[in-house]
């Protein structure tokens, strides 16, 4: 029922700007793909254990009540490449950059036009926060960090 709280037309296009001729339009690789691939606009070299901000030279407006989540590509994850950060706020209009982290043992090269991450649009809820003295209790309580896993 929360879906109806958001007065949003899911068929409205998301507007984006290619800031340079090096930019490549975000694309989905299949009709059922959750994310739109983002592409590097430049060449980069990322040594093992280092991170690099990768420029896409794309800016866009997020739909109302949505944010963009920058997620890793599974093929890059297999090579030890991960994403740092990863939230594009609804009101952000600047250039989209992707922080790649090389957790692998070899230098990783990014070439112009390489798919570096995927952008997933997700609805967001802006609750009012209320400070209280204590929270209601649950069976789980404060047990976290693997407490519900196998023992």
Curated annotation (Swiss-Prot):
Induction: Expressed in the early phase of the viral replicative cycle. Its cofactor is Mg(2+). Mg(2+) binds at residue 28. Its EC number is 3.6.1.23. DUTP binds at residues 72-74, 86-89, 92, 97, 99, 115. Signal peptide: none annotated. One of its GO terms (biological process) is dUMP biosynthetic process. One of its GO terms (molecular function) is dUTP diphosphatase activity. It catalyses: dUTP + H2O = dUMP + diphosphate + H(+). Pfam families: dUTPase. InterPro entries: dUTPase (IPR008181), dUTPase-like (IPR029054), dUTPase-like_sf (IPR036157), dUTPase_trimeric (IPR033704). Keywords: Early protein, Hydrolase, Magnesium, Metal-binding, Nucleotide metabolism. Belongs to the dUTPase family. This enzyme is involved in nucleotide metabolism: it produces dUMP, the immediate precursor of thymidine nucleotides and it decreases the intracellular concentration of dUTP so that uracil cannot be incorporated into DNA. This is Deoxyuridine 5'-triphosphate nucleotidohydrolase. It comes from Monkeypox virus. The gene is OPG046.
């Amino acid at each position: 029922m929360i879906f109806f709280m958001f007065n949003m037309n899911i068929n409205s296009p998301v507007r984006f700007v290619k800031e340079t001729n090096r930019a490549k339009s975000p694309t989905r690789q299949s009709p059922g793909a959750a994310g739109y691939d983002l592409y590097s606009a430049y060449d980069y070299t990322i040594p093992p254990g280092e991170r690099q901000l990768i420029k896409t030279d794309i800016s866009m407006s997020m739909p109302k009540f949505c944010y963009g989540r920058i997620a890793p590509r599974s093929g890059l994850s297999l090579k030890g490449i991960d994403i740092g950060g990863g939230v594009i706020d609804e009101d952000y209009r600047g250039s989209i950059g992707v922080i790649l982290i090389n957790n692998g043992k070899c230098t990783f090269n990014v070439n112009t036009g390489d798919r570096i991450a995927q952008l997933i649009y997700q609805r967001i809820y802006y609750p009012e926060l209320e400070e209280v003295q204590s929270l209601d209790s649950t069976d789980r309580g404060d047990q976290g960090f693997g407490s519900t896993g196998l023992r």
